[in-house]
Amino acid sequence: DEIDDILNGDGNVERTGQTDPNEVPETPEVPVSTPGEIYQLGDHLLLCGDSTKPVDVKKLIGLGEADCWLTDPPYNVAYQGSNGLTIKNDSMEDTKFREFLRSAFGLAEKALKPGASFYIFHADSEGYNFRGACHDVGLRVRECLVWKKNALVLGRQDYQWIHEPCLYGWKDGEAHNWYGDRAQTTVMEFNKPKKNDVHPTMKP
């Protein structure tokens, strides 16, 4: 039901698939995605791939086709979830991390239409590298949004984090599209998921 809600939007439009809804493929013996594998979810494509590799990005989208880019890349904070899950590329030397971000952001910039918006979740401790990588590839940050969670994340720092910053802007070249109203603020209050069972830092 949750996936149907995502694919059908507000539920006012019922979309039908190309096969019988009860015709579900058999679960493979080892249900693990492999690099290069693409899944189609309604009109959407999901790739098991690497957003720093042009060949992977081209499998999903061409130049100047994307209306929006929302990303939650590694924060470079060596995070490990309570269940032991870790994130690849989350503990890199400073200049290597900047280059890693620059590679991914550069490909995203090429995929965006002029005027297309972007949202980049990040760790404030790496704010210089995230903002710098945006600057390096010609993406201008217009605002920094804050996702305020309903509960803190217990950590090792003096102040416990209850928010995550998110860089917001759009690609130059055309006026950007805005789909909200004038009542939106830079603070977005959403409950964090009750458990991070499929990814160490799940978003709502």
Model-derived features: positions:
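Core catalytic lobe of class I
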Residues: D1-P204
